[in-house]
Amino acid sequence: VASLGKALGLTGGVIASDSNFIQEIKNYDTFVAAAGMNPAYVQTLAQTGNLVQQQLKKLQDNLNYLAQHLQPNPKINFTTNYPSIYLNWDKSNEILLKNKIVITHFNYPSDQKTLNRIVISANHQKEDLDQLVQVLNSFL
């Protein structure tokens, strides 16, 4: 699944897999909507290889930094392989907002559970990550 296209300014995504996996994910609300990619955006992306590599390195550095500083917590779902942190407790959005941290916070139509997701980017500074770590580690 390639979902970083939107992070790079593209207006669509791509899923490349075998047909069994494609059929399986069609059952999930998160994968039923689609948007075609603007060819001009794709061409621009193709011409920015060096910049993309630099940003990917910064993103991976940020993810590794978080992995080193976040304390293990069953309410925090995080891996250095994916630039999002999923939070599994009801008051997380309120607490983060009080600390001036804005997250993705919504419900999918067929899911009663609220999605609380923090998206990590290459543009986050060490100070941003330190603030996030401090707040998340205080939930222990």
Language-model features: locations:
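Active-site C-terminal subdomain of aminotransferase-like
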Residues: V1-Q71
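Short, low-complexity, polar/charged sequence segments that are solvent-exposed and flexible
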Residues: S19-I22, A33-A35, L45, T104, ...
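Conserved C-terminal alpha-helix-loop-beta "cap" of PLP-dependent enzymes
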Residues: N64, Q68-F139
